[in-house]
């Protein structure tokens, strides 16, 4: 069972992102403040959940959270400042949208940089430990999946409805055949490994 938050003295927001390892599309970051008594049996790291459960949980989170926000950082911006800084920027911008403003941040991952004057704690695999980070993980993932489904209608040849922009063999082969779309991250390696051809 997940702990609700990392600490209980200060109003805490859990933060996570989705799409960091993708070849195409924006990265999405989310920040969520949950009520202290929030519990849902399905809530866990979004990568461990079925798609159906993720979307069902998104409805619950959006309805029951004290506050939530999702922020998109485009592929163009990722190429400009790099994916790590784009993830940090996305989380910071999501936090700034929260009302009420949190007093503490619980961040999924091993590092974080922000200009926000807020204390924070980085937690490796935090989305499998704390409900507020898991909730942020669900929002970031589902909002990003919706976005990739929209892009897939424009560029069906890359299989984004299925791979969501991640570097699958099929996605890399499509890049080799059709070249890069305007939504591909130009600074990422799109080459297919020779071993993947066999």
Residue ranges of each PLM-predicted region?
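RNase H-like, Mg2+-dependent phosphodiesterase core
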Residues: 1-198
């Amino acid at each position: 069972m997940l702990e609700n938050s990392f600490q209980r003295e200060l109003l805490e927001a859990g933060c996570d992102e989705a799409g960091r390892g993708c070849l195409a599309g924006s990265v999405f970051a989310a920040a969520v403040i949950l009520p202290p008594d929030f519990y849902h049996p399905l809530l866990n790291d979004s990568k461990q959940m079925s798609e159906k459960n993720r979307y069902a949980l998104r409805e619950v989170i959006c309805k029951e959270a004290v506050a939530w926000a999702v922020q998109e950082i485009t592929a163009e911006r990722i190429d400009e400042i790099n994916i790590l800084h784009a993830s940090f920027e996305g989380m910071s911008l999501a936090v700034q949208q929260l009302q009420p403003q949190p007093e503490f941040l619980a961040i999924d991952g091993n590092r974080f940089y922000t200009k926000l004057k807020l204390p924070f704690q980085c937690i490796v695999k935090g989305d499998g430990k704390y409900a507020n980070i898991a909730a942020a993980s669900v929002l970031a993932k589902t909002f990003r999946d919706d976005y990739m489904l929209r892009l897939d209608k424009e560029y069906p040849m890359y299989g984004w409805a299925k791979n969501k922009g991640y570097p699958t063999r099929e996605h890399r082969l499509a890049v080799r055949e059709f070249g890069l779309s305007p939504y591909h991250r130009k600074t990422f390696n799109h080459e297919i490994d020779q071993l993947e051809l066999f």
